[in-house]
Design a protein with these regions (language model features):
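Conserved N-terminal subdomain of the carbohydrate kinase-like
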Residues: 3-12, 21-32, 47-126, 130, ...
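Short beta-strand scaffold segments in enzyme catalytic cores
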Residues: 43, 87-90, 220-223
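Conserved phosphate-binding/catalytic region of the ribokinase-like
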Residues: 2-10, 164, 168, 172, ...
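Conserved beta-alpha-beta core of the PfkB/ribokinase-like small-molecule kinase fold
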Residues: 121, 125-201, 218-219
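Short catalytic helix/loop segments, enriched in acidic residues and glycine
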Residues: 31-43
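A short, N-terminal amphipathic alpha-helix
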Residues: 40-51, 204
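Active-site metal-binding loops of divalent metal-dependent hydrolases
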Residues: 17-19, 249
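Short, conserved phosphate/pyrophosphate- and ester-handling motifs at nucleotide-, phospho-/glycolipid
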Residues: 45, 184, 247
Length: 301
């Protein structure tokens, strides 16, 4: 049985997750940039004209970086943290490996409660299992708000600072809170390995309306609660482009097209694929790229 249905986003979206400082080394070329779901999805929602809030945690020394997001019209709800989440992404072709040398403190329920009455969609984008405290998922399960969840961070583990596949304890509570879920094809295998069954069975068990599965240049597919399966094709992307954040952009563009613009699944998927391809071609890079000069970033306290 579907827990929530018939949604239209009219008041806005709150994106919940880490704001990160990423060192992306793409095909041998490195750059430092502002990242995380709050950056990529937040800017994508603003490009669709939706009022957008972010709920995040960041070290005080790095808080001025959020001005890049507020300049785009994003409203900031940021709590302090001893550290800022940082990733090192090594990208060669379609292959990516990650390290996470630093992570912020978890996002708490009281932060999320502050935006609940201002929006009609919560976009959850945890980047690691402890990014958002599990109580947030329990809180959102009982709310009338549309909940969109990217599971990427809940199917990751850390081993000696390296990011590897592995499901955590927060996976099931996040699924129980979500109406729309996104994984890539590899992440889906991790979910199914941890919980068993298939996509249709999990959607029924957790009352999920739509499940988006991305597969980079192979396109992907979108499953619906009524048993539908909607394949979509990937849009051609610029060779050698940086794919970091493309999944965040895809999910935000899909959510906006589907629930704000009222497009059907197929058209929303096609629009999201086009937005992701534009992102890989660096459509957002001019706003988010940071200077590589070391003294432009203050050390964390």
């Amino acid at each position: 049985m579907i827990r929530r249905s018939g949604y239209r986003i009219t008041r806005g979206v709150a994106v919940v997750g880490s704001t990160t400082i990423d060192r992306n080394i793409c095909n041998g070329v490195g750059r430092l940039q502002l990242g995380g779901v709050t950056t990529y999805a937040g800017l994508a929602y603003r490009r669709h004209g939706l009022p957008t809030w972010i709920v995040t945690r960041i070290a005080p020394a790095h808080r001025p970086l959020l001005s890049r997001l507020s300049a785009a019209g994003i409203r900031i709800h940021a709590a302090g943290s001893d550290r800022t989440t940082q990733f090192i992404n090594y990208i060669t072709g379609s292959r990516r490996t990650q390290q996470m040398p630093s992570r912020a403190a978890p996002i708490r329920c009281n932060q999320v409660r502050r935006v609940l009455d201002r929006v009609d969609c919560i976009h959850l984008g945890p980047l690691h299992p402890a990014d958002i405290e599990c109580a947030v998922f329990h809180l959102l399960r009982d709310q009338p708000t549309l909940v969109v969840a990217d599971l990427q961070g809940l199917v990751r583990r850390l081993r000696s600072g390296r990011v590897i596949a592995g499901a955590g304890d927060a996976l099931a509570p996040a699924l129980a809170a979500a109406d729309v879920v996104k994984t890539d094809a590899d992440e889906l295998e991790t979910v199914l390995g941890a919980l068993g069954g298939d996509v249709a069975g999990l959607m029924a068990a957790f009352a999920i309306q739509e499940w988006v599965v991305t597969a980079r240049e192979r396109g992907g597919q979108i499953f619906t609660a009524c048993g539908g399966r909607h394949p979509y094709s990937a849009e051609p992307a610029v060779a050698g482009g940086d794919p970091t954040g493309a999944g965040d952009v895809f999910l935000a563009a899909y959510t906006a097209a589907r629930f704000a613009e009222g497009l059907d699944v197929d058209r929303a998927g096609a629009q999201a694929a086009a937005a992701a391809a534009c992102h890989v071609a660096d459509g957002l890079g001019r706003r988010t790229t940071l200077d590589l000069t070391p003294n432009r970033l203050q050390p964390e306290g």
